[in-house]
Amino acid sequence: MKKEKLLQLYKKYGLTQDDVFKHQHYVIITRTGIEKIEAKENIHIIYKSIKAETNFAVIKAIGTLDNRTMETFGSAMMQEYKQEIIKKKNVEGNLIDDIKQTRIGNCNTWYVCEMAEKRAFSRIVLKLTGFYALGVFGEDESEDFKKQ
């Protein structure tokens, strides 16, 4: 059922193999695919900046398709790495110092406001057209969703 519905939507919006790919856990639509969907449906979108700082931004997208209006958010935080020294046992059981590196943030570029807008755009288009209900995400929504 889900696969059939996705195929119907792909045909309806003229999506090709270049517009869609399978991620480890999800189906992903590329930026060009989302642009095709938005253009075909003529979705009206208004953006509002909720927060815009040097390293973090949140954009609200309010989208209208036919007589339905939805809103969603896109956010982006500049990616940083936090390092800390931790104690860990080596193979002999002795405590040694090790470095633990943690990734903080979800955007590897410095233009966080633009990335938040792209994410909000992807989400509102996919929500209004039924793709989100089928577990489909936009390529811009996560750095982990980039095509390999």
What does each model-found stretch correspond to?
Residues M1-Q148:
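Polyanion-binding surfaces on beta-sheet-dominated domains and ring/shell assemblies
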